[in-house]
Amino acid sequence: MAGRRAQWRLASAQAAVRGETTVSLFGKTGEVSAWLTPEQLTDPKKTLAEFEKTVKFSSRANLPPVEPVPPKDTEYKPEGEVCFIIANGESRRNFDLNKLKGKGYTFGMNVLPVVENFWPDALMSVDIATVKWLSEKDVPAKLEHWSYPRGGVKDPRIKRIAKDWGWSSGPTATRVALEYKKFKTLYILGMDFFGITPEGIVDEKKGSKLNNMYKGKERYRKANSDRTYFGNWLNQMVTNTTNHPNANFYHVVLDNQSSPNKLAQKTNWIDINYSKFEEHLQEMAKRAS
């Protein structure tokens, strides 16, 4: 695993590519310029690509033996109310989010309601510029909009998390669902981790391109951009599963898709395909009737 300094530099390069001047990691926030030289900032995409290669090489050099994935129970066995975490990976592209209505609490992120016209119960945005953009479109007036307690966020309608964890939107939304909302049964859609191939396959090794529903749209990178380093998201979700062993995380994936092994080893992280997910939704409808 890459050292903390390397992870800060990598996160800073990612922030620079997004046009941000600050970076958050390990519960702290700092200036991007503190971690990158002026030369590196002139071409942040090139800098990011170099850092990703370094981190990948370091990770492989220290790779422990792969542990087998334990058997999982994929049947519908909810505890309490259900929460749907809607991330923005392309694996959910052909799923109609309206099927979730009336089945449980929906927690989306970033531009979901504006671009897809699907309004979840709650929305998570951790990037200050995105929060401002959504506020200008009056999104916080129509749903519960969460973010970190950062000074750049002035809209009083935004619900502030008590402490800035420095996490990405998906893992942060999951943690709020667990620790603020107290859900113990979570379904996670579109949290793909890996990049995507030109054929649209989510793959850890061959998926070299950006995997995001909104690539090419306002506030997002170009459609042909390289994939984003997922190590930080992965570690954050591992923390969620570890800190909440009594919660079940149903990770909804395509038939040819799987979770990173580090998560798959967790007994409460359960991959299910969309056919099995549809079965679960039908069971929810039966319980509600």
Residue ranges and their predicted role:
Residues 4-9, 49, 53:
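Basic, mixed-charge low-complexity alpha-helical segments
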Residues 40-55:
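A short, charged, amphipathic alpha-helix used as a generic interaction element across diverse proteins
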